[in-house]
Amino acid sequence: MRLVILSAVFLFSYFSNLFSQNILQSVNPETQGISSGRLKQVDANINQWIKEGQLNGATAIILRNGKIVYHKALGFSSENVPMKTDNIFRIASMTKPIISVAAMMLYEEGKFLLTDPISKFIPEFKNPVVLDKYNAADTTYTTVPAKREIIMRDILSQTSGIGYAQIGSATTNAIYYKNKINGGIGTPYSTLKDVITKLGKLPLFVQPGEEFYYGLNTDVLGYLIEVISGMPLDKYLQQKIFQPLGMKDTYFFLPKEKQARLVSLYSQGNNKMSIQDSLINLNGTFSRDFPKTINGTYFSGGAGLSSTAYDYALFGQMLLNGGELNGKRILSPATIQIIVSNQIGELLMWGDANKTRRFGLGFGILTEYAERTLMIPAGSYGWDGMFASHYWTDPKNKMVVVFMRNIWPTEHWDYGDRIKPLIYQALK
């Protein structure tokens, strides 16, 4: 009897694991209205970039109608090590959409309104001030009172006035460095509570709600999730998003048994690719190998996750499905609609005079201008990562695309745009 029970448990475990690994099924592209022959342009161009020394390697996955029509690894993940489709990448700011979805799950539970001041949950943000004058010689500054408090919508839409440490302007870098505020990536020790409560006492750089000002907003959002849910951010994500969706390779800090699959972070300069020292100075400490940290404690909501192309495609397909995948509902369709709707009005993103993108709640939303230049339909949404990774969901064509690289700095950020016509020209 014991043998029968053990056999049954084994079979259940085996088939459960097998099923979880195949939530997304690979099919012939032709069955989904995509030309296999024309899709070869993707391979041809990526291989050419590798041959020219502009790229070490990449993985890409394309879904249409919930099916995998393309999933390949090209080039090398490290020196003389071929890239594989299950290689793990530092996804940097592609973390932001995931954290934004996690926060909106709490919104659906009635835990906050988008108009709530964040000081309701983090008192240090009460009575904010805005930078007025700054003296670069001694890093002193004066401030003026903010016109209003930061609200949850500001944090989710990057309009709070909070800046970025380490990779921001010279002024934000200096003020944050002096106050030991890091950029949230590559600095695994410390905690969200320590950093965000200090951040709340520092000046904003523009008035809340008046500009799109890319900054540490999603790190703040990560701490808000911890405060509101009562759970550490990493545990909340595992329980509420990663496990339900079958995202088995997405972490802030990788388990030891998965670390060998992490690709090297290359650098590019003078048309050459190289692997630099792990620890570099970037207006503060930055470790290229931060995902391998043992017992890391800083869960950067803005840039800290590592993942595979397949895992991220699961997340993208959930959004395309209106918040559900494989029988597990993460968000309602109504909430998804809020997330991917323009939340910044006519505010420009990084001086984008062509208004190529608008911003929702954690997602960039492409406009008609992008459709006219890159073939990607208006209303498609997604985000990119500092280390040259790219993701978008295209509701019109029922597509999800993830293009993973790990290069910083790179002379060819534009490959994220160049790959778009290569994909869309293959549609029948």
Predicted segment positions?
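Short, surface-exposed loop or secondary-structure junction motifs
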Residues: 129-378
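Structural recognition of the beta-strand scaffold that forms the well-ordered cores
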Residues: 59-61, 71, 154-157, 213, ...
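Short, conserved phosphate/pyrophosphate- and ester-handling motifs at nucleotide-, phospho-/glycolipid
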Residues: 35, 96, 308
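Structured C-terminal helix/loop/strand segments within mature extracytoplasmic catalytic/sensor domains
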Residues: 383-428
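Bacterial Sec-dependent N-terminal signal peptides
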Residues: 1-23
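Short, conserved catalytic-motif segment at the N-terminal edge
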Residues: 23, 27-91, 111, 130-135, ...
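Extracellular/periplasmic catalytic domains that process cell-envelope and extracellular macromolecules
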Residues: 54, 82-83, 113, 143-149, ...
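Active-site SXXK
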Residues: 43-47, 66, 89-118, 126, ...
